[in-house]
């Protein structure tokens, strides 16, 4: 059985008891170096993923030697939103061989930090989804509230400006949520287009200003 384990936004305090239990009982634990460091795992049980993540996961699910083992694959945030569930299904894993363990998403943390009800917001990920930039553009043009995970925040901001959004439009930028270097700032698109930001970023547009 393959368990896709949501590990939350990064701080160990946001791990669920279920996630900890699954990892403790797993025969193999697979994840990025940063994800693996959240747990106390014997070295012989670890598999560290690299930038060739898709190729490595393909090899893993095709490996006959793991068929009867408990495999925990660590997914940042929640595996069902911009996480590894979709990736695994795309590369050939079968739903009946998978159990998804929910985790706390950075979207939820961002909403808590800004004290907003995320049920009132559209939620979009731009991670590897060029077409979603257009969706984001239309939402902002229509003054809709939106929480989004940027792909390249600087370039995303330039895209919005180049397609008619006022450069002074304000966006909340929440970087490295739950880490010691967490930073939350309200910036204009113009400032964002000229800035540098962490790749661990959530953005929030509150939808209540003139474009």
From Swiss-Prot:
Catalytic reaction(s) noted: Co-precorrin-7 + S-adenosyl-L-methionine = Co-precorrin-8X + S-adenosyl-L-homocysteine + H(+)
Residue ranges that the Swiss-Prot or TrEMBL entry lists as coiled coil: none
GO biological process per UniProt: cobalamin biosynthetic process; methylation
Pathway: Cofactor biosynthesis; adenosylcobalamin biosynthesis; cob(II)yrinate a,c-diamide from sirohydrochlorin (anaerobic route): step 8/10
Catalytic EC class: transferase
Signal peptide interval: none
Keywords, in A-Z order: Cobalamin biosynthesis, Methyltransferase, S-adenosyl-L-methionine, Transferase
Family annotation (InterPro entries): 4pyrrol_Mease, 4pyrrol_Methylase_sf, 4pyrrole_Mease_sub1, 4pyrrole_Mease_sub2, CbiE, Cobalamin_biosynth_MTase
Pfam families, per database record: TP_methylase
GO MF annotation: an example: cobalt-precorrin-7 C15-methyltransferase activity
EC number: 2.1.1.289
UniProt similarity note: Belongs to the precorrin methyltransferase family.
NCBIfam families according to UniProt: CbiE, PRK05787.2-3
Listed name of the protein: Probable cobalt-precorrin-7 C(5)-methyltransferase
Native source species: Methanocaldococcus jannaschii (strain ATCC 43067 / DSM 2661 / JAL-1 / JCM 10045 / NBRC 100440)
Gene name tied to this protein: cbiE
